[in-house]
């Protein structure tokens, strides 16, 4: 065995297993399997033009050398990004721990109670600091959250406002520039007339339905918004604040003013800058708007025994169910980062956060005092952490950069200096020395921080926060480590067993790919630092763009979108911009197959498109005749087709090139959803099938971990004609010559985790990437063959093969009273996370094993499903007290003095022998979804309620 081959470590099946797997499938070779799976006319005839694979050791040396090309200055740029201190106990036990970063979104609540509790802590932290009633479990970034706030306030207009088409939304010019740009992008096709101006001159016209202000403003000034909010209320204008999370420790909570929505980022709570992300945004609002809240919400409920349990609440709001009528297209959020930010608050507690905020504020005040002594005027009358100093910007910049210091320069005559948690008195004195050099004056050094405050009394926070016990218990490293481990043990992730979620691609997230994330040379780079200071990042990002462009067969790539849903939206906006540039801005019809992922129609609506659904044929494929008929019918207004390939049914449809040709013949562009790209890499590509743009899920195909529900990266790759329209950024120039507005806050989105995909491609190389795809298809077809006598596979290709996933039909079991949910919960007793349930077909399971799973693990999974199939045969329709209906079974049930169930404890907990050696115990019984929605509670319950559990 070659110990220097990363492909051998990444791909699960061993060489000695291969023939047995092929025999089970009924083919002689992998080549034959691929031939029978992928249509002849779309297979690539040349290998990918990428460098040969690096070993893990070679890659470690390579990425280290690149990191040294990043010149990480002391940076005081601010603009929503501040260097923070990540406590080592959180870095070691969460960020670097596969028990946390390999988990999936907590749809199966019984095996996700740990991260659900961590997310409830996050929601409680946000609710407390903002003074709002309800918060979600994170969004992608602050700018996206602000755009979602605008969309929510538009959705909750009263009946008269909707009747009168009140569509104006005011945004303060003090809002962060990237937020304004992204909101303008979003408002464009939502029928919202967004007006940017001075909030002090706002006329409170009845033409407005909402307004957003920054708190504090982008240059650091704290404004007293009390009268503004009151006047908005009187004019029936709802208000949103974009608030700095750390400043809320010292400033009046927006909720006390009667604000409707508060958004922001929690990056300051210990999360590395990472050249733009990933970071967890927050979104808090009033309870009356709970059904319009974007993203996931964690709420309290009960399990079958009446014990407290947690689960994702109000899931009917989500795109999978509401589709084009969903509250938002957001699916992936930033769970891992939200967990870390929440743990930062748990570790420091209210007193620790006050200490940090006080030091930051005192440092800013002390710096102002020292600069005034040098003769510089400071423009902010009230501030928390940022001072705005009058000075010759070009001269100051030259001196500062010579001393490896970055400021923000809003104009030619001033600079903003944002203090952060890492700023020391030595750092302050270095800043003072720069201004002294500029003024050619001697200066005195700061020895002790000032006790003066720059926050007016009426704007100081007077209410308590983080009073719940969880924020006041775990302040030693020992206690926090044990608390984190206690939560981790409640969750099933890839470090226990395979997670076969269809359309989710839960593959290995290799340690070699993950290690660079902890390197401060990558972590401490500000996204708005001058590009020449980020040579290491620029090298990685440009090469990754090239790699993805080659893999997809397109001409250019943008890494900016922070999730697959955001990538979908970006791709559709690029198509709209293309049509407008051609004088065909009226093209707004988007054809979407009925089987499409729910984010597709939700994204299309956000892009201002009219969704027209096309039928599926009996075999699950797109009905080509129906598609042609609708394309011709709408040819004058056809903008795009959204198509997933291979299909969401797990099939390479042979008519795909005919389908894309129909769209092009009728004036449209083809958008390919890249959710299933793991079945294409190296064998075919979106360009080959005739698509014009696709998004990729780097958190699926390219090994970024799911993190329990984020981070994600959803880059878009485009054909030549769409290249000029790739998204831009108002602070650092990115994108095409005719760039659409910002899609994410940061110029290159979540740059830090792009290192993972870069490493994945570098270490697999051309051959390894193709091999990974082949083995993903092999593993799926092996499972299909093993289950063939026990479950019906709904869809197959023309030669009887699945792509990288397949759907098994569980609907016939209703005759015995068994639902697909019962099978999902019973799989927990066997130590497995359920496959994807009821998508894209209700009453089914979609299974995707990925290339990373070994034959023994595939066999354990198949054995579990076969055993469950036998259990189904043992029950009758009148029997509701059986091993499936009562699943999952907890250790509390098994060790109870009483056992009144009609089957043995052994059957309940150890249905297969191997479980005696490696048993995963769910911490709660089956949760009551309806109870949780009827009794919504989205902050930490009182301690006595935990005691009842």
UniProtKB/Swiss-Prot annotation:
The protein's name in its UniProt record: Glycine dehydrogenase (decarboxylating)
UniProt source species: Christiangramia forsetii (strain DSM 17595 / CGMCC 1.15422 / KT0803) (Gramella forsetii)
Cited InterPro entries: GcvP (IPR003437), GDC-P_C (IPR049316), GDC-P_N (IPR049315), GDC_P (IPR020581), PyrdxlP-dep_Trfase (IPR015424), PyrdxlP-dep_Trfase_major (IPR015421), PyrdxlP-dep_Trfase_small (IPR015422)
Phylogenetic placement of the source organism: Bacteria, Pseudomonadati, Bacteroidota, Flavobacteriia, Flavobacteriales
Gene Ontology molecular function: glycine binding; glycine dehydrogenase (decarboxylating) activity; pyridoxal phosphate binding
Any one GO biological process: glycine decarboxylation via glycine cleavage system
GO cellular component: cytosol; glycine cleavage complex
Function: The glycine cleavage system catalyzes the degradation of glycine. The P protein binds the alpha-amino group of glycine through its pyridoxal phosphate cofactor; CO(2) is released and the remaining methylamine moiety is then transferred to the lipoamide cofactor of the H protein.
Catalysed reaction equations from the record: N(6)-[(R)-lipoyl]-L-lysyl-[glycine-cleavage complex H protein] + glycine + H(+) = N(6)-[(R)-S(8)-aminomethyldihydrolipoyl]-L-lysyl-[glycine-cleavage complex H protein] + CO2
Pfam families according to UniProt: GcvP2_C, GDC-P
Keywords from the named record: Oxidoreductase, Pyridoxal phosphate
Entry's EC annotation: 1.4.4.2
